[in-house]
Amino acid sequence: MKREGKKVVPSLSNLIEKFSQEDVIAVMEKEYQAAPARLIPTSLIDDTSFIKDIVIPKDVVSSFAAGLKEKGFYNPLIVRSKGDRFELILGRKRFFGAKKAGILSLPCVVRDAEDEEVLLMLLADTRDNRSANVLEMAVVCKQLSSLFGYTQQTLADLSHLSRSQITNILRILSLPDPIKKDITLGKLSYGHARALVSLDGEKLETAYKIINEKKLSVRESERLAHALINNEPYLENSEPIISFSGLISSSEREKSITLNFNSKEDKE
């Protein structure tokens, strides 16, 4: 631990150890259920500044609004003080659902958290929440990297992913805004996005248009991207031709054939 004035600031190793744990957010929220919650006017709570551009689909907001009207709040929101207002840390869907439902005051636990810890909480939440959007994880990882110098390996350890997966997730941020919007709204999956980031320029525009018009699956989108990269015709509803080179050897006695594939992907 290190001291900054009178405030104790967790070290990087302590933060990583804490937020790399499974279900750290679920445990945290369970602890907050027993803590005294404070009713805060909804009008005084602002969305988290880090992921405010990630739009929650209207149907999801409406579903949460209906649930809150029927059952009320089970878990309080987690917020932090920002001057005379409050900034949301966790509970975005409940927050926007409550606003749509017209709920005027919300139970909140006010947490004293610096920006780095807030981002780590958001990353752990997207990691543990299967319904979270991959673009949200990309935005959080990018900010941890640019603001606090987190390496891709550290982000991979925190996210329980491989370094190459983190690289692919971060590449999504380079996609044009209309594509990122479709990812946010759930119209395109991470698999679709991964196929699209391998393209640029006119090829990217072409692939995006075809994927939307023909409602291609992830596998079909990958075949389309492969065809565009290699300037080959895209054959819908067909398996890609696997290419291989080198020796094709056989043994009369063992009745075997040896194929040398061009890549691990072709072999699989």
Which role does the model predict for each range below?
Residues 2-7, 15, 25, 41, ...:
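Amphipathic alpha-helical extensions and coiled-coil-like segments
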Residues 46-54, 122-127, 254-265:
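Short hinge/gating elements
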Residues 51-52, 81-82, 128, 139, ...:
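Short, contiguous strand/loop micro-motifs
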